[in-house]
Design a protein with these regions (language model features):
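Alpha-helical transmembrane segments of multi-pass membrane proteins predominantly involved
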Residues: 1-110
Length: 110
């Protein structure tokens, strides 16, 4: 079995790559993909923690290992909503500005 530390290191590397892309890239699509990468890094950490510290079965019919999976499900729902709204905003910005560069997009002037 792979130790928890390896999963957390991989999650931290993915999250750091997402933060670096978010801070240094200028294309809105790339920034959007970096945000999704950060959310997936958090999902990996949730699954790793849930698998490592699952808890004990108390007879209630709920598997304690599923707690991390439930959090991941909610994060995926939020990510899907964020993707829908984000892509709609990106399309609207591209139609009005004809660019996806965040330096050239100034929403205060037409």
């Amino acid at each position: 079995m792979v130790p928890l530390f390896y999963y957390l290191v991989l999650s931290a590397i993915l999250f750091a790559c997402g933060v670096a892309g978010f801070l240094f890239k200028r294309n809105i699509i790339t920034i959007f993909m970096c945000i999704e990468l950060m959310l997936n890094a958090v999902n990996l950490a949730f699954i790793a923690f849930a698998t490592h510290w699952g808890g004990t079965y108390n007879g209630s019919g709920v598997n304690p290992y599923l707690s991390g999976h439930v959090f991941v499900f909610f994060v995926m729902v939020v990510a899907a909503a964020e993707a829908a709204v984000g892509l709609a905003i990106i399309i609207a910005v591209f139609r009005t500005r004809a660019t996806l560069n965040v330096d050239r997009v100034n929403l205060l002037k037409l």
